[in-house]
Amino acid sequence: MSDYKFTLNLPETEFPMRGNLANREPEMLERWTKDGLYQQIRDSRIGRTPFILHDGPPYANGSIHIGHSVNKILKDIIVKSKTMSGFDAPYVPGWDCHGLPIELKVEQKVGKPGQKISAAEFREECRKYAAEQVDGQRADFIRLGVLGDWQKPYLTMDFATEANIVRSLSKVIENGHLHKGVKPVHWCTDCGSALAEAEVEYEDKTSPAIDVAFTATDSKAVAAQFGVSDYSHPVAMVIWTTTPWTLPANRALSISPELDYSLVEFAKEGATHAVILADVLVEACMTRYGAESHNVLGKVKGAALELVRFKHPFLAFDVPAILGDHVTTDAGTGVVHTAPGHGQDDFVVGQKYGLEVANPVGDNGVYKPDTEFFAGQHVFKANDNVVALLKEKGALLHHVAYRHSYPHCWRHKTPIIFRATPQWFISMDNQNLRKQALSEIEQTQWIPDWGQSRIEKMVENRPDWCISRQRTWGVPITLFVHRETEELHPDSVSLMARVANRIEQEGIQAWWDLDAAELLGEEAEQYRKVTDTLDVWYDSGSTFASVVGARPEFHGHGVDLYLEGSDQHRGWFMSSLMISTAMTGKAPYKQVLTHGFTVDGKGRKMSKSIGNVIAPQQVTNKLGADILRLWVAATDYSGEMTVSDEILNRSADAYRRIRNTARFLLANLNGFDPAKDLVAVEDMVALDRWAVRRAAALQQEIIEAYEQYNFHIVTQKLMQFCSVELGSFYLDIIKDRQYTAKQEGHARRSCQSALFHIAEAMVRWIAPILSFTADEVWQLLPGQRNAYVFTQEWYQDLQSITLDTDLSDAYWENLLTVRNEVNKVIEQARRDKRIGGSLEAEVTLFADAALTEQLTHIGDELRFVLLTSEAKVLPLADATSDAVETELASLKLVVNATTAEKCERCWHHREEVGKIEAHPTLCHRCVTNIEGDGEVRLFA
């Protein structure tokens, strides 16, 4: 064999079998940075149609987690695939840099502003801290292979962005959407600030659930309304609440106008009580109160009790019964304790009746000094004291510890309160913002489509947006209000423009350093500067204007796509929609795509306490970023995304199949120069033409899947192609031709041309997902080419040609089915030790007329398809008794060990081996390939 092995076309490539991604990827990143790859991509798309994916900014605090990785990788796949489709798709990553979490971190280092450090110095420390966090996260995102303008990302703390945020607020004000009001807002007593809806989490909490009697000011008159005359016992209306601490702020009792209410007399421990309850809840209440007996004295509709007055159980005033649509009979008594300063529904119904918005609670959750009974007590600690006082006053009918879902601060994980405070709001209804936003939601494509109904419900039910915060590190609400009337300065919009210009030069500190007289002149003494800062959701929510609308690479083109986790319907998607609609009357996006959260193999959230956290840094250091990227792409992101070490190892296995396919392609393109060796598709061997045709069809399917953001379908089709159509069929068949045919002959060059087309296409298919591997393949492909695959478009030379004389795709699919049946019988013969490899087999196929016509069409080349040394086709009717039945009714098989000698060069067993005098160890085919013009292949 030593004489002939040099006549073989052995595969050869520098592309290693093992990716060694963890070590090699950083080297590639270094080259990408050095070569200015992102700018090369930008330059390659000048003048093309823009596609703008706007990056929702992660918060600049802490290391990135697996959820961040999912988000950034999905965005990167989209941007790269859109670029491959010819779009100008810039990607400018961003960070959210203001707000409480950064303040808390800085407080731990330097203390609270105004104590050991001035507010100005504190802001500067916050800016430094945020910049450090951005640097850390940026390095981790780059390591994932995400391409973008990492040198010039947008930061909400950039002076220009801070200024543009102020400018966007001035437009909201100009359009009449801002108002100031005393309203109940989510309030964290630990933060000392209002919270946005998106900053509220719900956790279980145990609270005292109490039934409290409010005695009528005129019991006899109330009883008469129920048809009971001259009633002698006190009559009380009963409320049920889980927030006893709000009772000092009670100003009414809400009932439903349509519900039936009963006057119930019941006996307990020798005393007679008369109470008003919703009729459907009477039995449940009597059981709860431990009534020994009870009797319904009369019923009326709730509407009949409107404005009847009842005494507050421990304060010296009385309150009215009022009608409210928010009253239900799901629990309690059918009567709702109403404190307009401590609840949204309470506030709304209170406005209708002109009730006082009482707020006896300070910023720190402690009752104010003038609060009777409870001054100086923290509200949650006062609950027990309220209960004790009610008991003392004889107003407590029942008391039990009650476990329920309760709002908590997302940062402190502590229970929050509803508290009326003077705040700045964007009104949902004054200028029809709610109606406009709902209309815009309908014009937007939501992926998955359930996102539309989700955000619609949120917009329909959301209160006015409280955009003010009482914090130090944030974009200031740059307003001047009159010291006496609290009215905005009439020139607020133009004043804000002047302030924004200063902030653009000096940052937000310019507002606090500003002497009002510089802008207001003699009016300065009549006005005061607002010291509140903006909700950070306003910062990020306005970036469609402050960033996309301002940076030159976006060309003034609107945003095409927002892509974030499914929690952002109430977060970034919502705030962006509100601000954009308030500013322009339009949504800021055309499409909104959401992905699910990451969970472990058992469906649990990632938690340090459970010990199931998968850190992206560990994955890239161990397996490589391309494995993480493949897992993201292969997972259906519309639901929860399951990740574990086992799942990532499965992704690594899948990756190896793709890598091995790429390696086979490259190794067999050794010595191929497309400039002179490329065979035209119409001149190819039929099987090669089929392979190119299949690749062309697959490319259309892959492009369509990318366009629809169905990346898991891309990976499924890619794996199917690599494993089945290529790996188990085409590549398996062509190995013999590739290795043994004449090096420059048509049979081999046809095959190499097909491999070249497939490799050129496939490197582009995988580039958005397996970016590092695609770059590695691209550098080793033969022929003249640009430096990077990422500047290319989808491969255009996959000509899907079918000649009149060609065998159809269905023909090759049938042949693949036959081949699989033959393989089963050969495998059994190997297990029976009748043969070694398949080339030691002679196979006889007994086939019906239709199948015989197909199998004989390619003549002697059938043996190359079946990977046997001999293949004979005989009529099915002639099947011998030892013929094996197959899953095809039209086919039976016999496999025998060949008696022919083995060709030393190609290992086929042929009768002529030993009969050729010049080459006694070779077959005719090999002699032709080393001395003649090379074998002729037409079909396979």
UniProtKB/Swiss-Prot annotation:
Source organism superkingdom: Bacteria
Task: Quote the function comment for this protein.
Answer: Catalyzes the attachment of isoleucine to tRNA(Ile). As IleRS can inadvertently accommodate and process structurally similar amino acids such as valine, to avoid such errors it has two additional distinct tRNA(Ile)-dependent editing activities. One activity is designated as 'pretransfer' editing and involves the hydrolysis of activated Val-AMP. The other activity is designated 'posttransfer' editing and involves deacylation of mischarged Val-tRNA(Ile).
Q: Which reaction does it catalyse?
A: tRNA(Ile) + L-isoleucine + ATP = L-isoleucyl-tRNA(Ile) + AMP + diphosphate
What name does UniProt use for this protein? Isoleucine--tRNA ligase
Motif 'HIGH' region: which residue numbers? Answer: 58-68
Cofactor(s) needed for function:
Zn(2+)
Keywords linked to the UniProt accession? Aminoacyl-tRNA synthetase, ATP-binding, Cytoplasm, Ligase, Metal-binding, Nucleotide-binding, Protein biosynthesis, Zinc
> Where does it localize?
Cytoplasm
Quaternary structure and interacting proteins, as annotated? Monomer.
**Residues that coordinate or bind Zn(2+):** 903, 906, 923, 926
The free-text domain note is: IleRS has two distinct active sites: one for aminoacylation and one for editing. The misactivated valine is translocated from the active site to the editing site, which sterically excludes the correctly activated isoleucine. The single editing site contains two valyl binding pockets, one specific for each substrate (Val-AMP or Val-tRNA(Ile)).
Where L-isoleucyl-5'-AMP is bound, by residue?
564
Chain's gene name: ileS
Its EC number is 6.1.1.5
Q: Which SUPFAM superfamilies match?
A: Anticodon-binding domain of a subclass of class I aminoacyl-tRNA synthetases, Nucleotidylyl transferase, ValRS/IleRS/LeuRS editing domain
- Recorded GO terms, molecular function? aminoacyl-tRNA deacylase activity; ATP binding; isoleucine-tRNA ligase activity; tRNA binding; zinc ion binding
Broad EC category: ligase
Name a GO CC annotation attached to this entry: cytosol
Q: Whose protein is this, by species?
A: Shewanella sp. (strain MR-4)
What does this protein's record comment on cofactor binding? Binds 1 zinc ion per subunit.
- Where's it mainly located? cytoplasm
Q: Which residues make up the binding site for ATP?
A: 608
